[in-house]
Amino acid sequence: MHVSLNISIKNVQMLKFTSINKENPSKVESKVRSKNFDEIYANFAKQKAEEQASRCSQCGVPFCQVHCPLHNNIPDWLKLTAENRLEEAYQVSSSTNNMPEICGRICPQDRLCEGNCVIEQSGHGTVTIGSIEKYITDTAWDKGWIKKIKPTINRDQTVGVIGAGPAGLAAAEELRKLGYKITIYDRYDRAGGLLIYGIPNFKLEKEIVTRRTKLLEDSGVEFKLNFNVGEDKTFDELRKIHDAIVIATGVYKSRDINLNEQNFSNVVPALKYLTASNKVGLKDKVEEFDSGLLNANNKNVIVVGGGDTAMDCVRTAVRQGAKTVKCLYRRDKNNMPGSQREVENAIEEGVDFNWLTLPTLYQGNDKLEEVKIVKMELGSPDESGRRKPEIIENSEEILKSDLVIEALGFEPENLPVMFNESSLNVTKWGTLKVDYKNLMTSVDGVFAAGDIVRGASLVVWGIKDGRDVAGHIHQFLNKNIEKNKRVVNE
């Protein structure tokens, strides 16, 4: 029997990068956006998304895909977008990524997919991969194409996931698809981890995250929030409840430069500052914000650091109405670890960057009032291959400040102590030690994924690790079933 399918497929010629120039979605003017916390980039209009997608050169070896941690099938969904086959584009995109619309917003594409786009290397300007990725999945949400998970089989085994950040959420979704009963435990009152409390609204509006967590909840995943392992239930009790455990707590301990010997209250870690700002945006009452301690309004703010977290802090301070905002970084602009796009946005919004600058002393009476700094120059490369900053003699200066925010990265908390589980082995960096063949920790049936294994990293790496650990847990639980069957038969 012949079945006629009424499908209109637009035959689109790709490789249009020579005739169509690169265009980004429109961005709110800096004077306007610096006064609110709304997302600053608009979505592509349909025609513009199709045009920009058609610029893809459909490389035989797609370096954009190679350099994406998830190895997303980027050329395929670009071609489908150009052909107005958007639902198929979403299906391809979501087959390798649990949160494409989030990655499209916050991934540093200039260091990953777009930074390795072949047509960028030939001077034509990269394909706007991130913006198209965001457009595809935002459209999928609007059109109702994203449905709750309906496993083909429901299994009796349960998996406990400790941590509701990117790695934990990705692992939970993949395991739920396989039919396992999933419970996610998180210390905070909302699921999402740093997606909710660490990343400002102007980069990632919270509704984008909460619709993802609601989708998991609607799909049968149970969330237990305000839950502290070791207090509400012991780690051993969780192991008895579940057939497997995933630890995906992330890394929340802030690094500091040990200059605050006088414990000035107006020297604060980045995450504390950003969490307060995000909670205020969520209409929570935050006493330290209301008192002015974590509010940059009318203050001379100094942020120490050069990564994406530092950029989040300086741009938040601008929006809170800071008098001045300075960013101190010990290397130059070209050697900053964060996204260059975020640096440019911060410059447009009035942030004063002090490159090659190192704070050496915090000074004040009851509160910090001044920061003593020295200027640096880049010397020979160190063991990491980066040029080592060296102090220039007699270059000391004094900067006035009412608030210093230290954005120097994150370290793991002491989980064996927090969980009262001494058999959890850690590395010399404090991250959980795992067998990289299966991501299992030193405790049988307990796996780990995300930053708590690899150290502070990108959301996209957390998603990848969550997907990977889900596959290993599935294998582990299947082997246990087979093992138990053999024991019964014997």
Predicted regions and their residues:
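Active-site-proximal substrate-binding core of FAD-dependent oxidoreductases
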Residues: M336-S339, H474-E490
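Immediate flanking context of iron-sulfur cluster ligation sites
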Residues: N43-P62, L86-L112
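A conserved FAD-binding loop/helix module that cradles the flavin
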Residues: C313, I452-L477
